[in-house]
Amino acid sequence: MISAGREGAEEAAAERGVDESGRTKLVAISVLTSMDENALRSIGVDGSIKDEVARLASLSYNAGADGIVCSPQEAQEMRELLGPDALIVTPGVRPEGAEKGDQVRISTPSAAIQAGASKLVVGRPITCANNPVEAFESIISELKN
């Protein structure tokens, strides 16, 4: 029973973003995946999205964040910039053929992982699916292949 309790606690901690040491992980949000270059300029940022994500990632990581939230399109550059231990969390992940919705900078689950993502955020393609369990299982199947 103690082992089962410990395993359950470890699983719950993993689901909450707590590592083996019990420390909560902190990731910094960069540029929203719903933003394009025009949207970035409209808030006063003149550089490219990739440059702004890199700037924010460097500032955050150097200040002690464990990683960055960025689109899958910036994941490879962030992995190279921040190194192998950084958490790269990528929203904007959509299975092939899924609706883009308001997301601009998207990728498939397998492409996001190949680009260096540590964690994927897949929301509406699962929650808005006719069969969410089937949608989830399809994504897992894609990742296993």
What name fits each language-model region?
Residues 60, 78, 112, 123, ...:
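Conserved, mostly hydrophobic/aromatic
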Residues 2, 6-8, 12, 113, ...:
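C-terminal helical cap(s) of enzyme catalytic domains, especially alpha/beta-barrels
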Residues 94-96, 102-135:
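Glycine-rich phosphate-binding active-site loops on the catalytic face of alpha/beta enzymes
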Residues 74-75, 126:
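Alpha-helix capping/helix-boundary segments
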Residues 1-63, 74, 84-85, 95-98:
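Conserved anion-binding
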Residues 26-30, 68-69, 87-93, 120-122:
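Hydrophobic faces of well-ordered beta-strands that scaffold small-molecule active sites
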Residues 48, 70, 101-105:
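Short secondary-structure boundary/capping elements
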Residues 82, 119-120, 139, 145:
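Small-residue (G/A/S/T)-rich helix-start motifs and N-terminal tracts that mark the onset
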